[in-house]
Every structure is written in C-alpha cells, then in structure tokens.
C-alpha cells in the first residue's frame, strides 16, 4: 500500500506543466535544482512545505521527489531531454 504524503505537497501530475514552464523561464535548459527553485518561486510554495522530507530519506525532500517524477514523464513523452547528468532541455525551441 502506498504511503500517504502531506496534502500540501503538489503531486507529480500537478507539477508537469509548472516544470515545463520553469524550463521555458530558464531559457529552455536547467539543472534539477534550478528547475525546482523556479517551480517553488512560480507556485509560491512555502519553506515549510519545501522542507518536508521524502519518507525514509534524509537527503531528498518530498517536493523534489515529486518534481523528479514530473521531469521523468515529460522526458518519456519527448517534451524534454536529459542533455547531461542533472540537466534537462526542452526538446524543441518552438515549445
């Protein structure tokens, strides 16, 4: 059974469009932490929510974990590319 996460944390499905928009705002390319910082800024997510840790881990926040999945789905559908380790780029400049 899946563990429930704090309801204040956006799920990956609701972070897909903000991730895409963050990459556009970053000029079409960004590192994982830059993308996450832009999402936090755009969605005005409080520090309290940002600091909630992913279950069983002390090195990753739940928000970061959910953002990782949003990037994974965008990548699977060809919207973004993992151009280098920890760097994502929009697949087409026209997007």
Regions found by a protein language model. Give the residues of each.
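Short, positively charged loop/turn segments that connect secondary-structure elements
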Residues: 8-10, 40-68
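Short, hydrophobic-biased segments on the C-terminal half of alpha helices
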Residues: 71-72
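Minor-groove-contacting beta-hairpin "wing" of winged helix-turn-helix DNA-binding domains
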Residues: 86-91
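Short, solvent-exposed beta-strand-terminating loops
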Residues: 29-43
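Positively charged, polyanion-binding regions of nucleic-acid-associated proteins
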Residues: 2-33
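The feature represents the first ordered module of a protein
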Residues: 22-24, 36, 59-62
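Short, amphipathic alpha-helical interaction segments positioned at domain boundaries
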Residues: 93-95
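A short, conserved structural fragment
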Residues: 75-85
């Amino acid at each position: 059974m899946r563990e429930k996460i704090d309801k204040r944390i956006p799920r990956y499905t609701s972070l897909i469009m903000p991730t895409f928009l963050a990459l556009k705002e970053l000029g079409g390319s960004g590192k994982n932490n830059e993308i996450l910082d832009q999402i936090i800024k755009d969605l005005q997510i409080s520090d309290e929510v940002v600091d909630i840790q992913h279950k069983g881990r002390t090195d990753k926040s739940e928000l970061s974990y959910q953002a990782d999945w949003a990037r994974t789905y965008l990548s699977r559908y060809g919207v973004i590319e993992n151009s280098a380790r920890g760097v994502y780029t929009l697949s087409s400049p026209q997007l």
